[in-house]
Amino acid sequence: MSGFLLVTLVAALYSGCSVADPQISFKPPEYVEEMPAREVEESFGNAGSLFGQGDNPLFADRRAMKLNDLVTVIINETASASSSGKKDLSETSSSTMNGPSVTFGGPSQSIGNAVNKLNNFTSFGLSTGNNNSTFAGSGTQQRQESFTTTVSARIIKVMENGNYFIEGGREILINGEKQIMRLTGVIRPYDIGRNNTINSRYIADAKIMYETQGEIKKSTEKGWGTKVLESVWPF
């Protein structure tokens, strides 16, 4: 019974102190949901024209323009950060206090002698000496990450202002290791190249996720016991 209570206590402690993995919500931004979709206008070319609108016209713009059209996204993200800090503190203090002194200017010699004896008795001083306190600290942090790949996305909504809300994803399973990639965002049709590609730097409200699942990921993660100790360790 005591063993069961111990396991329950550890599980509750772990669930309460463990830090959840970062997550991304791929829900479209509010303005995308609130903005009406553009009405589809069917246009047909003149009979015999080389610039047709069929499935395989001789000359046509190959860029994505309509709902459910595909566009290739070239993801080329680089993030770098550098920060440094330095702090120096110094403090010095000292104090001295002398004993009291009594003076007498009267004609009585006996009183004068008594005053002198009293001054000799109280001629002491108090000194706290010098107190020095110093602190020096400095720190530097540098970080650089890059991620490059391509993924096809689909036009989910053509908004009233002509912009596209796109969504794409890819899952790859190789030798028990699963790679998952997903992205969403808003693009302008003018930023799509002639080869129907767009760079990720032109995507507004971009949300890009890439993660792996499998034994390799498990082997690089800390055990739950280590996570519990780190979450409650105060030092």
From Swiss-Prot:
A lipid is attached at C17 (S-diacylglycerol cysteine). The keyword Membrane applies. Residues 1-16 form the signal peptide. A lipid is attached at C17 (N-palmitoyl cysteine). Belongs to the FlgH family. Assembles around the rod to form the L-ring and probably protects the motor/basal body from shearing forces during rotation. NCBIfam families: PRK00249.1-3. This is Flagellar L-ring protein. It comes from Wolinella succinogenes (strain ATCC 29543 / DSM 1740 / CCUG 13145 / JCM 31913 / LMG 7466 / NCTC 11488 / FDC 602W).
